[in-house]
């Protein structure tokens, strides 16, 4: 058995512009090779574009997009007697928002378009309107969990 103590979760500092932890998490997810200021500019430009195009508060649209993209259940592989089962599990809130942000950034990157800020803005607006690759991924995750409901008793 491990003798290590449980490590406390570090609080995520909110970003300076919107004072939001979600925006801060998105900036960190966009960042590559430690270029945080470039990642911050991309996210802030995307949110500004969202605000201009929708005529709403950009942070509200972004939070709605993340809420829409957050999965409620996911499947985890569990080995039982030589067979591997996909066991549906409920998603905790912090993991759900992390998955939603991961999918938002991934599908923004795979999108066609000129700038990353533009692609991210389009993906955020699509997710807020319950369309786009991110929402498709959430629906696929829910379908997988529904299909494997028979193995729910293997939950751990």
Swiss-Prot record:
<keyword id="KW-0687">Ribonucleoprotein</keyword>
<dbReference type="GO" id="GO:0006412">
    <property type="term" value="P:translation"/>
</dbReference>
<dbReference type="InterPro" id="IPR023798">
    <property type="entry name" value="Ribosomal_uS7_dom"/>
</dbReference>
<dbReference type="InterPro" id="IPR000235">
    <property type="entry name" value="Ribosomal_uS7"/>
</dbReference>
<keyword id="KW-0699">rRNA-binding</keyword>
<dbReference type="InterPro" id="IPR036823">
    <property type="entry name" value="Ribosomal_uS7_dom_sf"/>
</dbReference>
<dbReference type="GO" id="GO:0019843">
    <property type="term" value="F:rRNA binding"/>
</dbReference>
<keyword id="KW-0820">tRNA-binding</keyword>
<keyword id="KW-0694">RNA-binding</keyword>
<keyword id="KW-0689">Ribosomal protein</keyword>
<dbReference type="GO" id="GO:0000049">
    <property type="term" value="F:tRNA binding"/>
</dbReference>
<comment type="similarity">
    <text>Belongs to the universal ribosomal protein uS7 family.</text>
</comment>
<dbReference type="Pfam" id="PF00177">
    <property type="entry name" value="Ribosomal_S7"/>
</dbReference>
<dbReference type="InterPro" id="IPR005717">
    <property type="entry name" value="Ribosomal_uS7_bac/org-type"/>
</dbReference>
<comment type="subunit">
    <text>Part of the 30S ribosomal subunit. Contacts proteins S9 and S11.</text>
</comment>
<comment type="function">
    <text>One of the primary rRNA binding proteins, it binds directly to 16S rRNA where it nucleates assembly of the head domain of the 30S subunit. Is located at the subunit interface close to the decoding center, probably blocks exit of the E-site tRNA.</text>
</comment>
<dbReference type="InterPro" id="IPR020606">
    <property type="entry name" value="Ribosomal_uS7_CS"/>
</dbReference>
<dbReference type="GO" id="GO:0003735">
    <property type="term" value="F:structural constituent of ribosome"/>
</dbReference>
<protein>
    <recommendedName>
        <fullName>Small ribosomal subunit protein uS7</fullName>
    </recommendedName>
</protein>
<dbReference type="GO" id="GO:0015935">
    <property type="term" value="C:small ribosomal subunit"/>
</dbReference>
